[in-house]
Amino acid sequence: MSDTVRVYEIAEEAGASSQDVIAKAKDLGIELKSPQTAVSYEDAEEITKYMMTGKSERLATKPAKVKKVVKKEEVKKETEEIETPKEKIETVQKVEKEIIKKPELKKVEISKPISKAPQKSEEESENLENPNKIVPKRKGLVIIKKKRPKEEELEEQQTITENQSKKQMKSLSEILGGVDDEEKSYNEPKNKENDDIKKQKVKKEKKKPLIKTQDHGKKLDVDREYSDEFASSDDSLLGEEIVLLDMDLSDSYKIFDEPKPQNIVNQSRSSKPAAFGNVPQGLKRGKRKKRIVRTQEKAEITSVTIPEDIRVYEFAEACGKSPAEVITVLFSLGMMVTKNDFLKQDELEILGEEFGIEVTVKDALEDVNYVETYNDEEDIDTSSFVTRPPVVTIMGHVDHGKTSLLDKIRSSKVAAGEAGGITQHITSYTVTKNGQEITFVDTPGHAAFSAMRARGANVTDIIIIVVAADDGVKMQTEEVISHAKASGCPIIVAMNKMDKETANPDMVKAQMAEKGLTPIDWGGDIEFIGVSARTGDGIEDLLENILLQAEILELKADPTAKAKATVIEASLEKGRGPVANVIVQNGTLKIGDNIVCDTTFGRVKAITDDNGKPVKELGLSQTGTVLGLNEVPTTGSVLVAMDTEKEVREIATTRAEHARAKELSKSTKVSLEEMSGLIAEGKIKQLPVIIKADVGGSLEAIKGSLEKIANDEVKVKVVHAAVGGITESDLVLAGASGECIILGFNVRPTGSVKAKAKADGVTINTYSIIYDLIDDVKHALSGMMSAVIREENTGQAEVRDTFVVPKVGTVAGCLVTDGKVIRGGHARIIRDGVVTYTGKISSLKRFKDDVKEVANGYECGIMFDKFNDIKVGDFIETFIQIEEKVSVDD
């Protein structure tokens, strides 16, 4: 760093312009030419001190500049004349002390002569006549008159009474408030000495030119807040502005405004260090601050509780890991996933072991598990318990007489109303026997209704397995036995069709014993009862056994509790809306109850019993239909009554959102081994279908059956499946899906829908028997499959000689040894047991004539398509290709 300072840097530090610094330096005897002139540190400090305080050691030792020589004895007199009250306002304490000590005096320069009084005193006249008197040079005081007083105003001021002119004037220091005692004691004798002197301005004979100085002080308007008395005096400063240059009223009496404090942070960023003192020197580029990164030590995660359905990134957040770490671990195990894929239970366990974290899986629907809440919160009051009727489910193979047996018990003809004579809906009825009610649930026996049968087994107390005595145990019978054993309910075997001559009850007992159901008379615990749905034989014994089993079970429930029921079937009926067929398991279901059923909710609007009659309530184990739900409920779901509509709405909405998110977010992750399978699956032909059914149970059965119809080449793609009639929106969806077929089960399209379907080219097929629907879909899939090409050998020939025909090719002279050779047929050339060529016969001749075929034992000439490498001893095998269609079942 250099030992000099520039003038402009001194000006910045002193808060003045460079010209002021040059002028002040000239007073101190330092010659400066321009703001870029370099000054030593000592001179710079002296100039700054002089500009700030008005004092300097060099100024004290400097010889006084006196323009005119005057007599010494007149100095004191001139000083007294200058010390007027006006000057006391405009001077400062330290300057007055310097006058007493007779320092070097500077001339006071007045901008304009003031003539306030027409008559002048003798002393003033003498002063004007002797302009060579020494006038002390005052530093930093210039009085600038803003307005020249008019003659009328001067005359008015002259008429002011002498008493007013003698009033004590306030000094500038007193006005500014802050004059110390020393200054007051010094001013008091001066005031007394000057009481007789008129308060007038000191004038000069000639008007001196005003020295132009840089205005680096603050203008002070002294007439702002003072009394009228002061404003009306002769020496008032009204209409004038005083420019105070470098005044020093000591450090505590500075008139100029204090500079605003600068932001230290901003100053440090935008200015470079000062040459001296603490004043910024100039702009500089601030250094880039280092960002302080506060690292918080994260607590190590040892265990997490996560929902059942969780994505990769959600699991990573819960474990405090990045998704990349989780994906890397799964990739090392041969699993290709993205951060949006769902994780399975075994994958969560593997990740937990890999990261050393205990993973606990929580059911996302646990908080809205209304069934569990109902079972836990329901007060058990045994005093309110009553015996409830048993719920009996009839199950068995198709066409074994289940519905006919139930019709005989109810004395009705339900089976006659079923399409094709087979049950395709799950139904329930209540029968009274000896004053006791029994609720029967009839299930379909077809293979497609496996889920229906399982649902019937879950809501029942007693299961009756119907087996035809002449037919024995069949496929669906074995399935029914499995459902019955899984339910843990008592089982009764009804051997139907005992009126037939071919009935063989012992065969049925033996077959059932092989399946684990041993009759009582064979030493087992299963009751076998022979019945006939046609004649009614054995039905009374069957009902008595049912009541006996119910008595042993001691079935009881609380009819005063809130209702709990199971939906065994659901549908959407025109004019009624969503309808649920339910069996009450506990409590009493009444009209007006707020109910929730899985993802649906509502208020019970109407109830009908099993005969279709409207009732106000359903009691224990009674069956009926309920209206009032907002949507068609899921078959097999539990219906519960609650206190408020808000409660049921929140539960249903939450469960619906979860179900929808789960459906839309099916995982797309595959293993590395499955990649080739996916590539091959892209070649599989699909048959898109839309399924509409009358009830939810049938819809479920049809959808499950169609999805099972698939092989390596074709499969069924269910675009949409719903309960209800065929609407125009289904046609729009079918058109958008491309070559989509609409399948209706027990539903019919209206005339307008048919017309629109014909115009749009959409195929609608309706069925009333599930067999027909499945068979038609199989035929459609079979038509989509490629035909199988089968080869059939037609003959064989041996090459005896070869002939080369120019520009034609090689002709093989052959002898037909087996069958016949056909022109245009396929042929293989076999040489030493190896097939060297497979192609077509382009030309066949016998002697010189073209022939269509040559039989066994005859010679012929054969040419092949684009092949001439024929040798003697080759064998020619001819064959034809036959295309054969295949079915899905094959």
UniProtKB/Swiss-Prot annotation:
It comes from the Bacteria. GO terms for cellular component: cytosol. Residues 442-445 are annotated as: G3. Residues 184-199 have a biased composition (Basic and acidic residues). Residues 532-534 are annotated as: G5. GTP binds at residues 396-403, 442-446, 496-499. Residues 387-554 form the tr-type G domain. This is Translation initiation factor IF-2. It comes from Aliarcobacter butzleri (strain RM4018) (Arcobacter butzleri).
